[in-house]
Amino acid sequence: MPILTADDRAIGTYRWHRGRWRRWSGRRWAKACYSAYPERLEKHRDWATYPELPEAKRERLLEIAVDIEVLAGATVVHRSRAGVVLAQKEKVNHLGHGLLTLLTGGVWGFVWVAICLTRKELRYRLEVDPWGNIWPVAAP
């Protein structure tokens, strides 16, 4: 495979990095969330040498991945042929904020409440490639 430069970063571009395959998500080189064959992600072998999975099996893999994400607290925003858009609230470190509130005599509690009320929603799309790997893609 050719060496990629910053200009070669198109969503869906694959790269071998630190002993496993990664894919450009639009923001970073991301690991696959799930895979039909996880061992393939750790082999430095061209993807074109593997057989492509049937569309029905890829759709089922995507459904399973979405179910797992929903169980972890995500919500489904949109489903399309391109993939499934999920949303998840940013996590708040309640233990750290609780300690800071105790150390500051309750003053930090106002900051803690403000953070909890204004936390952002992270959106991302899960899409499946022809070989059964589920990849996150940055949602706008």
PLM segments and residue spans:
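A composition-biased, non-transmembrane "mature-region" signal
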Residues: M1-T104, G109-P140
